[in-house]
Amino acid sequence: GVNHTNFIKKMWYQRSLSIPSDWNSKKILLHFGAVDYTAEIYIDGRLISVHHGGSSPFSIDISHITKPGSTHNLVVSVSDDIHSGLQASGKQSHQPNSFACFYTRVTGIWQTVWMEAISPYGLKSAETYPNIDQNQLVITPQFYQIANDQTLEITIYDDQKKIAQLTSKCANGDKLILPIKKMKLWSPETPFLYDITYQVKNAEGQVIDEVKSYVGMRKVHIANGMFYLNNEPYFQRLVMHQGYYPEGIWTAPSDEALKNDISLSKAAGFNGARLHQKVFEERFHYWADKLGFITWEEFPSWGMSSYAELASRNFLSEWMEVMERDRD
């Protein structure tokens, strides 16, 4: 946010947006990690997008209204009224001061904003499903566009050693199966992660897009009233994490602060956390994967009127965006 904790119903951001000259023929995306609450995005005075939801990410394709080698005027208008009953505000106080379990308010851009240039035929997403019972990883890719004879090559590494590879013709929604021999499981005690490289290639075999990621092979299910991890009963010792920071309220002061939250929790004997009434930054989940930490994510649903249809619409659409971001 803007480090101003009063009730702010309207605010504006403005800055110049310089497009590198070597971004010709690229799809240019403008990403917002989270803006509380309704964001209107303008470029050169033209409204190009509106997003409702203070905790979910959104991206805008600005290729058609920007020009490589030029500078544009970017304006973000934010509306935030936690008294309306139409928006989820979590533990933000509806009174001037904090009280009970309601704390300092957040308004405006509170997560990372960045711009990137990608191939128009690049990989849009890849949903991973670890099937430890069959010793395999199932990957479902989506692409921005698909050209004739375009292929996707997926390579899985165990500590820089190639252990599986698959090449397939690009198709949205295909389920691609890679066998994992001598599989290493992920758990809080042994948080092993496999590295994955995705390469999209054109008809000539040239790499037009490359994405590097990771995956943990693990299974979670409930049976006989018990929680199971990797087919074994598992006792969760969870801390309740509210994600408030003196320096930035909802915004962590640094990546190290997010990592330290998990390190301190594990040192105290906890193996996971209930993330209470807040959608945490993606980097928090990254460190949870790397360090071995179970997370139960909870939407900041407080503040909505149960009688307002618009509040339900706002909640459901935003929650789906959060689920899409954190589904793996």
Where in this protein do the model-derived segments appear?
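Accessory beta-strand-rich segments of carbohydrate-active enzymes
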Residues: 3-122, 146, 279-282, 293-296
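Intrinsic-disorder/low-complexity, polar/charged segments enriched in Ser/Thr/Lys/Arg/Asp/Glu/Gln
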Residues: 10-18, 27-29, 57, 71-73, ...
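Short strand-turn-strand beta-turns centered on an Asx-Gly dipeptide
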Residues: 42-48, 157-159, 230
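Short hydrophobic beta-strand segments in globular cytosolic domains
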Residues: 48-49, 163, 234
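Short catalytic-loop micro-motif centered on adjacent basic/acidic residues
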Residues: 49, 187, 271-275
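Active-site mouth of glycoside hydrolases
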Residues: 55-63, 83-88, 93-94, 103, ...
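Extended acidic/polar, glycine-enriched regions
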Residues: 67-71, 142-223
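Surface beta-strand/loop "capping" patches
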Residues: 117-147
